Regions:
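Active-site-proximal alpha-helical scaffold in enzymes
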Residues: 77-87, 137-140, 145-150, 154-189, ...
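ACP-dependent fatty acid/polyketide chain-elongation machinery
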Residues: 1-66, 241-253, 348-362, 406-410
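Active-site-adjacent elements of ketosynthase-type condensing enzymes
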Residues: 44-52, 107-111, 190-216, 258-278, ...
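Condensing-enzyme catalytic core mediating Claisen C-C bond formation in acyl metabolism
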Residues: 4-8, 31-35, 211-287, 295-296, ...
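Conserved small-residue
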Residues: 9, 27, 81, 100, ...
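Conserved beta-ketoacyl condensing-enzyme motif
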Residues: 7, 31-159, 188-197, 293-307
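Glycine-/small-residue-rich "gating" segment that lines the acyl/pantetheine channel
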Residues: 122-128, 169, 173, 189-245, ...
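A glycine- and small-aliphatic-rich helix-loop capping segment at beta-alpha/alpha-beta transitions
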Residues: 21-28, 110-124, 174-177, 197-210, ...
Length: 410
């Protein structure tokens, strides 16, 4: 018999809030976290805007020495995990039945860039012995596992911008199928560096707008690229009976997970949206419900011309003639695109949307593109009680992932 899986803890470091309360207040008040880049000199870059982490007190969570040999993306992951675990109030638990699955799209690119500079300026003997372990994508999961003494399972998912949704989905399966009782799942990213921004800009993937309110505009007729974000979100997934036995606070239930691969192009989605549509259908089937049961979709919605059109077709593929019945929004309009961490932040937002009976808006949306003719929640959130919600993530390489969450009612 398949076991049920619930969310019992939430932690987040994001451009619109450095804990779940601050983030949710920003969502309700329509705050956008996009501003001028301060992490590096943009004078030679066409891209001037990003969604950076602001006012994060790292030493509130760990002393300076503890974080000395952590890349920025690992610091974010450790802080989000600490928040989530404290929120879950897990104290006496079986470490051998506890796992960690954390995603990242790029990992320690800040460390890579810094050490490349040292190599070029001072020679190979001056490259830090900590360079490799600081840069590895899996080191966030490994470090968090050490922090928690979680010995049951530890893994990283690297599927570009679908990674964190895959991580949550894989954690869900590990618990549902009886391998683990607790999984710390999510993602972390810190790629607002000169090199990463230059690379994405060369692909013409980033918006070059200098107006922070018109840069990340998913589904808008004038959208022209995404805005880079950074941060981390972590969900504590727990087997239902395990959670009930200890009177845990339950935010929502994870009921379905689906994925697929376009097998089409290294960066472009299938033009008809069928790949992402199949991931949604797989999640719906896995949840044992029908498409009409879903009240809200937190879309991948990157604000690129290709993605938003393709995802619109994908939603139509999965929901058929009733596609207008489901509410859709992209919270990347507020957070920017956190790449491999985006699915975790958006799953956390979707969880709180279910709990608080409030649908987040797509901000700064002036004119909906006729090719994105969905039932989009525009500019102002909507108070609505829904039972099921879906969160989508799509990544370079043709990776498509969807999870379905169910409102928890005592």
């Amino acid at each position: 018999m398949k076991r049920r899986v619930v969310i019992s803890g939430l932690g987040v470091v994001s451009p619109i809030g450095n804990d779940k309360e601050e983030l949710w207040n920003s969502i309700e008040n329509g705050k956008c976290g996009i501003d001028e880049i301060t992490l590096f000199d943009t004078s030679e870059h066409k891209v001037k805007l990003a969604a950076e982490i602001k006012d994060l007190d790292f030493e509130k969570y760990y002393n300076k020495r503890d974080l000395k040999f952590n890349d920025r993306f690992v610091k974010f992951a450790r802080i989000a995990t600490k928040q989530a675990f404290e929120d879950s109030n897990l104290q006496d638990f079986d470490r051998d039945r506890t796992g960690v699955i954390l995603a990242s799209g790029i990992g320690g690119i800040e460390t890579i860039s810094n050490c490349e500079n040292v190599l070029n300026e001072k020679g190979p003997s001056r490259v830090s012995p900590y360079f490799i372990p600081m840069a590895l994508i899996n080191i966030a999961a490994g470090t968090v596992a050490i922090d928690l003494d979680a010995r049951g399972y530890c893994s990283s998912v690297v599927t570009a911008c679908a990674a964190a949704t895959n991580a949550i989905g894989e954690g869900f399966l590990k618990i549902r199928d009886g391998y683990l009782d607790i999984v710390v799942a999510g993602g972390s990213e810190a790629s607002i560096t000169s090199l990463a921004v230059a690379g994405f800009a060369s692909m013409r993937a980033l918006s070059e707008s200098t107006d922070k309110n018109r840069a990340s505009i998913p589904f808008d007729k004038e959208r022209n690229g995404f805005v880079m974000g950074e941060g981390s979100a972590v969900l504590v997934l727990e087997e239902l009976e395990h959670a009930l036995k200890r009177n845990a606070k339950i935010y929502a239930e994870v009921v379905g997970y689906g994925n697929s691969c376009d097998a089409n192009h290294i960066t472009a989605p299938l033009s008809d949206g069928s790949g992402a549509g199949k991931a949604m259908l797989n999640a719906i089937s896995d949840a044992g419900i029908e498409a009409k049961d879903i009240g809200y979709i937190n879309a991948h919605g990157t604000s690129t011309p290709l993605n938003d059109k393709s995802e619109t077709l994908a939603i139509k593929y999965a929901f058929g003639e009733n596609f207008k019945d489901v509410l859709v929004s992209s919270t990347k309009s507020a957070t920017g695109h956190l790449l491999g961490a985006s699915g975790a932040v958006e799953a956390l937002i979707t969880t709180l949307a279910l709990k608080n009976s409030y649908i987040p808006a797509t901000l700064n949306l002036n004119e909906i593109d006729e090719e994105c003719d969905l039932n989009i929640v525009k500019n102002k959130g909507l108070e609505k009680n829904i039972k099921y919600a879906m969160s989508n993530s799509l990544g370079f390489g043709g990776h498509n992932a969807s999870i379905i969450l169910k409102k928890w009612e005592d």
